[in-house]
Amino acid sequence: MDRIYIFDVDGTLTPSRLPMTQDFSIFFSLWSMDNTFYLVTGSDIDKTREQVPWYIFDRAQAVFTCCGNEMWIGKEQQYRKEFKPPQDLIDFLWDKVNNSMCPIRIGNHIEDRETMLNFSVVGRDCSQEQREEYYEWDKTSNERKNIARGIKYGWPDLDAVIGGEISIDIYKKGDDKSQTFEHIKNKHT
């Protein structure tokens, strides 16, 4: 069997939440002509298309977005797993936003991607500088770690995983990026 490559997007192929650099996109584009690869990300399809140039996106065997809960081949969605968060979880998250010791609050704290939630105390709309400030603050406060622990305790059927620099990804247990391996294995065996 030929080699198959699986790449995470944020922090691997691109700087966190930013587009692929021009130099790297040229390198990766040339590399992708002779290799079989898949992309996996916690981001939704729109953000992924902002980060990855279309000519690389289209060469991927598939792109798994929202932690593998959506699969795309080119512009066509192949599947989607729905997730409806319970209201008491939403209330818990708002309580964490309102009672955080971090002074930065920007907006877009709870992003419902319909297949998962992405939660951020500082807010998804923060600037790169605010993102870095929060990330440094969280290293010592362990705020995200403690919130994730609270989610896992209060909702044992859900998983909460620290994502990137400012957020927590929340989804049904087992509906994480590892689920993509089964799809890839089935296609190549």
Per-segment meaning from a language model:
Residues 18-109:
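Active-site phosphate-binding/coordination module
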Residues 7, 42, 65, 112, ...:
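Conserved strand-loop elements at the edges of beta-sheets that form or border functional pockets
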Residues 12, 69, 124:
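Short glycine-rich anion-binding loops that position phosphate/pyrophosphate groups of nucleotides
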Residues 5-7, 63, 189:
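Residue-level marker for buried hydrophobic side chains located in beta-strands
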Residues 1-2, 34, 60, 114:
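A general structural motif
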Residues 15, 73, 127:
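Glycine/Thr-rich phosphate-binding loops of Rossmann-like dinucleotide-binding domains
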Residues 2-19, 39, 181:
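Asp-based phosphoryl-transfer active-site loop
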Residues 103-189:
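Conserved acidic, metal-coordinating active-site core of Asp-based
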